[in-house]
């Protein structure tokens, strides 16, 4: 019991990291992470531990989680969350699971060999952090531009948007049967 909460603690406190076992104090810097696939959610984790405020956006609609679980209402207000006694209560049967929009290629691209229930775990680890906000349905370069982000006070923008359009190599058999591009997944 309480394995999720212990794991959550260890993402913020690492006694084996002698130089920086705890998250750093607030830096005052605000970072926009565009794209919440594996690169985006991993970068967000490290930026939070460096003391930065992080806003993650993704072009996909991200379904809200229950406020009792995430600590965030659908309107974005922070509320107390209930601790998770057994991580299995977070899991859904993968045959019945509906895509929630969070996770980029890990949500829609990685094969069934990877347990996509882990995306909810990753999302909760981020969303429960006070200096993290998450917005779906926001396309960087369309809905939100660089100028918009700078006007909103972001100090940095991290582009973690993955492979939206494949690069087709101009070589013989570049698209032969069996050759796949990132967007195929």
Go through the PLM ranges and name each one:
Residues 33-142, 147, 167-174:
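Beta1-alpha1 glycine-rich phosphate/pyrophosphate-binding loop at the start
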Residues 1-32, 136-185:
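FAD-binding core/adjacent interface of flavoenzyme oxidoreductases
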């Amino acid at each position: 019991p309480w394995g999720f909460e212990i794991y959550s603690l260890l993402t913020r406190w690492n006694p084996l990291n002698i130089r920086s076992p705890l998250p750093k104090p607030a830096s005052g810097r605000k970072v926009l992470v565009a794209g919440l696939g594996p690169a985006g959610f991993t970068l967000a984790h490290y930026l939070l531990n460096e003391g930065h405020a992080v806003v993650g956006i993704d072009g996909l609609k991200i379904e809200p989680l229950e406020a009792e679980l995430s600590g965030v209402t659908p309107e974005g207000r922070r509320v107390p969350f209930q601790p998770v006694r057994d991580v299995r209560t977070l899991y859904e049967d993968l045959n019945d699971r509906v895509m929630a929009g969070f996770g980029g290629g890990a949500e829609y691209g990685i094969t069934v060999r990877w347990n996509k229930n882990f995306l909810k775990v990753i999302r909760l680890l981020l969303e429960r952090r006070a200096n993290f906000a998450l917005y779906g349905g926001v396309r960087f370069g369309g809905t939100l531009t660089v100028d918009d982000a700078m006007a909103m006070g972001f100090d940095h923008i991290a582009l973690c948007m993955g492979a939206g359009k494949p690069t087709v190599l101009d070589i013989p058999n570049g698209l032969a049967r069996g050759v796949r591009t990132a967007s195929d997944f």
